Amino acid sequence: ADAIFGTDPDCDRLGVAVREKDGSFRLLTGNQIGCLMLYYILSCKKAQGKLPANGAVVKSIVSTELARAICKDFGVALFDTLTGFKFIGEKIQQFQDTGSHTFLFGFEESYGYLSSTFVRDKDGVNASLLIAEAACYYSTQGKTLCDVMAEIFQRYGYYLEHVESTTLPGIDGLK
């Protein structure tokens, strides 16, 4: 296998591991998976002449700014929301109510992705199909998802993200 996909038990988050040239597997971050899918969607829509002039991408405020550089390159608006897919869903509804933008993709660094408007929450099934399609497409060009991620970094710059979890138990945690 060139890639391994896995979801959480309720299938709303997706993790991806990609085989490196030395045969080992590299786990992609939620931000990297999101940017790979974003780049694939925008590239394909542009190549097909189907990239809407009012296209919009939505991400949470804690997700990578690399998405902003990708969106800018494709002339697509990027909107930040508070953390939580309910806010991405609300933004989609706002777009539909006003007709201001056409939703293209939404994601959070916590491995949640949304590429359609018929679901308003993160969707691991749809995301699995999308990243598998991207992996197949790039394999026809002799590239892996790691190769494409390297191309994205080279084109838009390298972005370092670091997630840290701090636990402050009980009453001592309040101090």
Question: At which residue positions do the language-model features occur?
Answer:
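N-terminal small/polar loop signature for handling phosphorylated ligands or for N-terminal nucleophile
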Residues: 1-16
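Catalytic or ion-translocation cores adjacent to nucleophile or general acid/base/metal-coordination motifs
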Residues: 29-41
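Short gly/pro/ser/thr-enriched loop/turn and capping motifs at secondary-structure boundaries
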Residues: 13, 33-36, 85-89
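Phosphate-binding and adjacent anionic-ligand microenvironments
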Residues: 1-3, 24-26, 44, 48-175
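Short Gly/Thr/Asp-enriched flexible loops that form oxyanion-binding sites at enzyme active sites
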Residues: 12-31, 67
